[in-house]
UniProtKB/Swiss-Prot annotation:
This is Keratin-associated protein 10-7. One of its GO terms (cellular component) is keratin filament. Interacts with hair keratins. The gene is KRTAP10-7. Sequence repeats lie at residues 41-45, 46-50, 67-71, 89-93, 99-103, 109-113, 114-118, 119-123, 135-139, 145-149, 155-159, 160-164, 172-176, 186-190, 208-212, 218-222, 228-232, 233-237, 238-242, 250-254, 255-259, 265-269, 270-274, 275-279, 287-291, 297-301, 302-306, 321-325, 339-343, 359-363. It comes from Homo sapiens (Human).
Length: 370
């Protein structure tokens, strides 16, 4: 053989896709180079140990290659492998080769976790997990890899598709994008009591199985329930929480910007600026919508931009800049604007108040003494 120098991961075909491994033969060197090694000392490049890259380790089309018959030997990354295991990365699947290209090979394990674990199904890249297994998490599988895959009973879909709420779960239904699990058994246990859904009840219908992209459309069919178990990221339009005055975290700011208010709904605390408290009563249809939310008696410039320090990120009124219009100061329209004190920052509604009754005379012709 010619004396050339190449790394063990070379894809050079001059040796028939075979490179030399150290220690396989007395004539092989320890320098990870091909140095006049006899062909019997060489192995297929995809079976080379670390630091070989999986670009040459696990070609998608190597179904019958020797590298696909030895990738499942017992190793740290595949502790449960058996000799009869067939690596899914060697089959045509939604896990493309690109998801393996940058992963270094583990010792005696060429297939990185992103493409295959012990329990990963090859075609749709949806793992069937047992216990607290975390296989296929942080994988390159997009949500599309799950839309056409039927849910298996007791299946554990990876985070990219739909988390399952178990006793140890802490992020159930967050950033969920599952679409096809509506009637599957794997969706029936989503609302078990857990830290993330402490108020769940047995009759709860998991909304994360219905296009849970955290938009109002995903929740319109969910009925409101007292202490409802719908995750914060995807509250139904009709199930906006009723918040107490001392509550400051009952909902995220995004829950109000795009929701259409129902009659009698309660505006969450996070959506109440000090200078603007929309009252949802009667036939009101504008609460919780994006608006400047200025009280009728304040000018547009009465409030500073939202404070990043404020717990509720709400605007704060400047006492000196709230200039009221005459109709805001008293029950009668004859009140003069100059009769009113500047608005108080402490007032929840930030309303100007009249300083002295004498200023607001019964008629508009009365001279003001302010």
């Amino acid at each position: 053989m010619a004396a050339s120098t190449m790394s063990v991961c070379s894809s050079d075909l001059s040796y028939g896709s075979r490179v030399c491994l150290p220690g396989s033969c007395d004539s092989c060197s320890d320098s990870w180079q091909v140095d006049d090694c006899p062909e019997s000392c060489c192995e297929p490049p995809c079976c080379a140990p670390a630091p070989c890259l999986s670009l040459v380790c696990t070609p998608v089309s190597y179904v019958s290659s020797p590298c696909c018959r030895v990738t499942c030997e017992p190793s740290p990354c595949q502790s449960g492998c058996t000799s009869s295991c067939t690596p899914s990365c060697c089959q045509q699947s939604s896990c493309q080769l690109a998801c393996c290209a940058s992963s270094p090979c583990q010792q005696a394990c060429c297939v990185p976790v992103c493409c295959k674990t012990v329990c990963c199904k090859p075609v749709y890249c949806v793992p069937v997990c047992s216990g607290d297994s975390s296989c296929c998490q942080q994988s390159s599988c997009q949500s599309a890899c799950c839309t056409s895959s039927p849910c298996q009973q007791a299946c554990c879909v990876p985070i990219c598709c739909k988390p399952v709420c178990s006793g140890i779960s802490s992020s159930c239904c967050q950033q969920s994008s599952c679409v096809s699990c509506v009637s599957s058994p794997c969706c029936q246990a989503v609302c078990e009591p857990s830290p993330c859904q402490s108020g769940c009840i047995s009759s709860c219908t998991p909304s994360c199985c219905q296009q849970s992209s955290c938009k109002p459309a995903c929740c319109t069919s969910s009925p409101c329930q007292q202490a409802c178990c719908v995750p914060v990221c995807c509250k139904p339009v009709c199930c906006v929480p009723t918040c107490s005055d001392d509550s400051g975290s009952c909902c995220q700011p995004a829950c109000c910007t795009s929701s259409q208010s129902q009659q009698g709904c309660c505006v969450p605390v996070c959506c109440k600026p000090v200078c603007c408290v929309p009252v949802c009563s009667g036939a009101s249809t504008s609460c919780c919508q994006q608006s400047s939310c200025q009280p009728a008696c304040c000018t547009t410039s009465c409030c500073r931009p939202s404070s990043s320090v404020s717990l509720l990120c709400r605007p704060v009124c400047r006492p000196a800049c709230c200039v009221p219009v005459p109709s805001c100061c008293a029950p009668t329209s004859s009140c003069q604007a100059s009769c009113c004190r500047p608005a108080s920052c402490v007032s929840l509604l930030c309303r100007p108040a009249c300083s002295r009754p004498a200023c607001c005379g019964p008629t508009s012709t009365q001279k003001s003494s302010c």
